[in-house]
Amino acid sequence: MEKTKNKITLNGIWTMSGHDENNNKISVLGTVPGTVYTILAENNMLLGGGEYDIFFGNNADKAAWIESEEWIFERDFDFCFTDDVKKVEIEFKGLDTYCEISINDSVISSCNNANFCYTFDISDYIKNGKNTVQIKFLPPVEQDSKFIQRDYRGAFSGQRMYTRRMQCTYGWDWVNRFVDMGIWRDVTIYINRYVKIDCLNARLNGITPKGAVMELYLKGQHDKKFFDGAFKDRSYHFETSPMVCFTVNDPDGKEIYKQKMLFREEVLTDYVTVENPKLWFPAGYGESYLYTLTAEVMDDCGRVITEKTVQFGIRDISIVEKLDEKNSEAYKTAEKMFELMTDKFAGENEFASFDLYVNNVRIICKGANWVPANPFPGNVSADKYKNLIRLAKDGNMNMLRVWGGGCFEDEEFYNLCDRYGIMVQQDFLMACGNYPYCDDFIEDPTEDEALFVENLRNETEQNVQRLVSHPSIVWWNGDNENQCCGNLNLINNARRISNEVTAPILRKYDGKRRFFPSTPWGGNYNNSPSRGLCHYTGYLHKYSDFIENTDMTGYVEFFGSFISRFANETPVLSCPTESTVKKFLPPEEMTAESFDGYIYHTKNHPDERYKNFGLFNHIDTGAKKLFGDFKNGSDRIYKMGILGYEWTRSVMESIRRSEDYSSGNIFWMYNDCWPALGWSMVDYYGTPKAAYYAMKRTSAEVTASVTYEDSRVVINISNDGIESKDARVKLNLVSGEGVVYSEEMTAQIAAGGLVKLAPKNIEKFILGDNKQDAIIVCDVMCGGGQDRAFYSAVSPSKLNLSKANVIMERKDKKIKLKTDKLAMFVWLDGDYVFSDNCFILLPGEEKEITVEESFGHSSDNISLHWLNS
């Protein structure tokens, strides 16, 4: 954060004016940061008002007219000129998107990038006393249509390809269309800001026996007229250039380094050796220690003109991609994965590992994709960021990928990831499209294309400088799914943007952090399970065929078959809690046979093959096939929710058994942009779905799974910790009437290791005519923690389960559950985060659950569901 004296915030109340869909004049007061949607909601002019009303039912369509109108934002402010005032600037951290800015009726500039912070010198426009700033916003789609339209296609909408704003809000398969306009970040006036720090960072140069050698890097600007005597600000005194004072504090706040330097050049570097450094590790592998670097720009008398502070972590990151030896186990696994591939992969016979090391420790990456937490991103509060990032850590995740169709998130997001040890992959903001480019390969390049490339270059440079200090960012991705042609087209626009725009900027500011030109990335044709970054969302048709055209027998093995060296998008589909669905669907639509409300809030994939079997059909059909016919609307929601649990469990248990081959799995997706069924693990309101609890369980340091291999039942115990573990294992064979067989074992699991145990003579109970009568439940007790895995030879809907009676007692923040019979998929539904959920209870077993209110808590009700109720 940069601290500068002499500034005036223009956040607060502005006047917004325009016309409604009937051309009636609108003029209202609204809060900035704010956009057209949020200000109309603030004034109860969107379907009764309130942020959530626009999300209820199909109300969003009734406000679509907003995107076609021009809107004017205006406010007055007072300014007092003194003899010392020599320079006045106005800074807009976020303007969405095409707009014209005026001060006192004089146009000062226009803007065309919502991802860019604009600063303008308004010294010649401002006056003593009352001043007026006005911003006229123009409809983005109308502006985009004015540019030359070559073959610039985009998934979901081609109306976004020139426009540098949040791409997903043109409509995606998980969010409605919300093409908004407005001021979505802070507005500030700066007086006599002759010095500005653009970039401050501490980079690890290496670790020696003496300590960690850190390069302190500062890039800034200063107005030379301020220092060479052309004019003087009486607040400060200079005989020469200003001074920069670097200060480093350790994680305990103790000052360990201080050094002053003359600020003569745009870039300053200094070096400090940190003795006995406390290293930054991702969650689950150690503490995420943060040091503090402050740069103060001073005059000769030591008075501070401006200062900037960043936190940094001392960590060494490397990604090892080593070719597999032919006939090795990894090579054989890679060959098997060709069964998933298309003809485009034919002939590919070189495979390679993908292993992330932090401080020489191999990291197994577990997490999900982050999308904007609101279609109006200025509405995402610090509390919502904290809730979501904390939930990720509590869910045993250690990585989020910031997806390229959203935005560069607020500083608070990255600060929280630094603090909680959540690693970040950061995409640059291009997704699922062919974006404009301009170079020698373009026939008759136009000014439109040249301006787009320059706009993109400025956006990239500014945001890299803003984010480079964060230790949580472990690598950059050039775009999302724009280079899936791989080596078949080496001169496509996306590859040229990565090579000629993005890569040079990263070499300049962040040369040591890895850059992948795109994701997926790897192999001759990108999206290979056998090397690099893979997107299994690109194989959605295989999931679709399995759900639509089979009875889903063997679903655990099917979902678990999709492993890769590093999966950057693994799909999972499900429904949120009933308490959440009630927030965005009216009661009649929760039970209607048409499912129009569900489909509206699920959206759909643009591929023609999903026209008649859309994403909602995947959820609805999959839930019915796995868990049986729906008893009522509430049961439908319950079963569509636990579909996500079983899908996630199947994937992650397979990954945990395959960590010699696969080093990471990032689900599509972590959070929601609006209230929806679909892909997320945590819903829009901050309430975890069943998939989240499966992720939490299977991503724990020690976790188990039960498989049937080579005619034997096998217990697999995985340890992702950095120390070996001793475990006690108890296996129970449970029928509808009770436990019919038990066995206990012990095991020692090496750090980063996998142990396979073979129980005795249990196969006969789960084979042949008996396979639907019992399940295997395996408890692993290790270091004070416990994991419970289960195995069934048939789908849950085919099990012969006796009806269980589960009793719930609730007191304060504790819930006690007790059952008389085996209870499958016990699910607590409410606006809460539970310490555990969607679990199995053995006959006569009691279980205690702790609860805390979720971020969007609005009801104290908790309902209880289980499969054999």
Task: Pin down the residues of each PLM region.
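Alpha-helical packing segments of well-folded alpha/beta enzyme cores
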Residues: 72-76, 388, 395, 413, ...
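Glycine- and acidic
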Residues: 275-278, 394-400, 445, 628-638
